[in-house]
Amino acid sequence: MWTFQADRLSGIVSALAALCVACCAQSPSTGNISVVKEIVDKLLKGYDVRLRPDFGGNPVTVGMSIHISSIDQISEVNMDYTITMYFQQSWRDKRLAYNDLPLNLTLDNRVADQLWLPDTYFLNDKKSFLHGVTVKNRMIRLHPDGTVLYGLRITTTAACMMDLRRYPLDQQNCTLEIESYGYTVDDIVFFWQGNDSAVTGMEVLELPQFTIIEQRLVSREVVFTTGSYLRLSLSFRIKRNIGYFILQTYMPSILITILSWVSFWINYDASAARVALGVTTVLTMTTINTHLRETLPKIPYVKAIDVYLMGCFVFVFLALLEYAFVNYIFFGRGPRQQKKQSERISKANNERHRYEEKRVREQVDPYGNILLSTLDMNNELLATDMMSSVGDSRNSVMSFEGSGIQFRKPLASRDGFGHHPTLDRHVPLTHHAAARNRANCRLRRRSSKLKLKIPDLTDVSTIDKWSRIIFPITFGFFNLVYWLYYVN
């Protein structure tokens, strides 16, 4: 009986002892801390940080996982992007396995300096730093089977080579490449832990100028002269948001181009207004171009926005040249052409007048009479002048002779009493007709010169009328081709 009671009591004590050990393991008691201290001291005693796990045996497999906290900046000028992330690596080191405590041990970050760590680096890194507020943001956690979890909070600036030919209607592909610096595939093998779910946080990011379209995880082996290395790549594709550029670049350029067309409705003799408007629009487009170049790298090829701004600049500049052409036509070349034309007309009239005088002189008989039958009867001007110089029918007598038609004018008697037809003498009319003809020709030439020298300033220029139609249609066609090409 006493034996049975002793066995029962021993079982109860053992159960209570096991329960106490479990409670002590789960609670931060002084005994538990001492156990952990003993475990850590035991693990680090004789640990050689210079040797990788399973040195000389199979390669160490290191799993990678990343949580993206933010993408802070994407710079076209420097061709890079800045990303803040939680970078975690895990591997198994049998030298760090323990059985005394069935718990994971999260240790101080300074313990990481006493353990072997993978020589991981970012291949396209430009500048990186480990956050150190309030202490270094790194974590080391040990599992009973020897698995080590090493986490860091890193901000890195990585290179991202961009093709800006379609800027700002472009899409870019940026990568973050991870590789071992010294260990080849014979010593260490990287892999994405969790496959496609190894990278998280990308789907909730909101960037001011970009939209993340997709992300891909790639693993490949690369060969260098020092050996083969396994490289992990995080690739994400981003699309630029066009809204900012429409408000800041495209709309101002369109409005300035349309503003330059206002000069087509301004009278062409208002030189100050049209020149001031044209020069102002040209300088404004130049300012927009200059500001844009300062925000982009100096690349050798033409970007999409360069094509658009250059097209707008050409339209604005052509609007200014259009007025220069109109001004030259109406106030430069026009008067010179009119002067040349009036000189040609004057020269032709003088030659005609000399020719007519020569013909008249050749057709005068010895008595000074003009034989009208030999003159050109179709010359209305000369006939009119001759008839007006002779006078009315009461003081003139027309006689028809065999040799032609002659004008005869009666001579006044010496004593002032009337005149007799029989006393008429042949009076030459050559000098009177020629003088009157010359006077009339001079008056007509002067009036024609006045008409030629005074342009009709009340009509709007035909060039301006056509410009009002051609410029908007051409600019609309330019926009149609531009947006169809670059958007699609």
From Swiss-Prot:
Keywords: Cell membrane, Chloride, Chloride channel, Disulfide bond, Glycoprotein, Ion channel, Ion transport, Ligand-gated ion channel, Membrane, Postsynaptic cell membrane, Receptor, Signal, Synapse, Transmembrane, Transmembrane helix, Transport. The chain crosses the membrane at residues 245-266, 271-292, 304-326, 466-487. It is found in: Postsynaptic cell membrane; Cell membrane. Residues 327-465 are cytoplasmic. PROSITE patterns: NEUROTR_ION_CHANNEL. Its main location: membrane. Glycans are attached at N32, N104, N173, N195. It comes from the Eukaryota. The keyword Transport applies. One of its GO terms (molecular function) is GABA-A receptor activity. GO terms for cellular component: chloride channel complex; GABA-A receptor complex; postsynaptic membrane. Residues 1-25 form the signal peptide. Residues 26-244 are extracellular. The keyword Ion transport applies. It is a multi-pass membrane protein. Disulfide bonds join C160-C174. Belongs to the ligand-gated ion channel (TC 1.A.9) family. Gamma-aminobutyric acid receptor (TC 1.A.9.5) subfamily. GABRB4 sub-subfamily. PANTHER family: NEUROTRANSMITTER GATED ION CHANNEL (PTHR18945). Generally pentameric. There are five types of GABA(A) receptor chains: alpha, beta, gamma, delta, and rho. GABA, the major inhibitory neurotransmitter in the vertebrate brain, mediates neuronal inhibition by binding to the GABA/benzodiazepine receptor and opening an integral chloride channel. This is Gamma-aminobutyric acid receptor subunit beta-4. It comes from Gallus gallus (Chicken).
